[in-house]
Amino acid sequence: MNILLCIAITTGILSGLWGWVAVSLGLLSWAGFLGCTAYFACPQGGLKGLFISGCTLLSGVIWALVIMKGSALAPHVEILGYVMTGIVAFLMCVQAKHLLLSFVPGTFMGACATFAGQGDWKLVVPSLMLGLLFGYAMKNSGLWLAARREKSQSVPAVSK
């Protein structure tokens, strides 16, 4: 089995499990899949990628709340919301100069999840973070399976 097939197998199994966990815990399954996606898309892997993805997802949640709360200060002035969105989007990109915030798509995923979750960060954050852990488990269990499979195929048969 190649690496892609191994990752596909573990991702399929754990995706089904995630669906059940999300429903059981009252979480947003779609937001969890954004967390999974963030880990898979992050250029860094392992624990470093997990940490960077988590930091960027959480920063996106915060930035979305800044836009939502800031726009609500003067709801009759629509342009304020547009200007805030532009400024915050700029800052979301600029923050990437810091290593822990260097995965820009993760920041936007966190913000999008917060907008879609209507600003309910107490529901969005655990959904994203648990989904992120599932993404880590999906990819790394697939890599483990591929390495184990490769190792078992490379061991020569011993005859008696």
List the predicted regions and their residue ranges.
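Short, amphipathic, aromatic/basic-enriched membrane-interface segments that mark the entry/exit
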Residues: 1-4, 20-25, 47-55, 72-77, ...
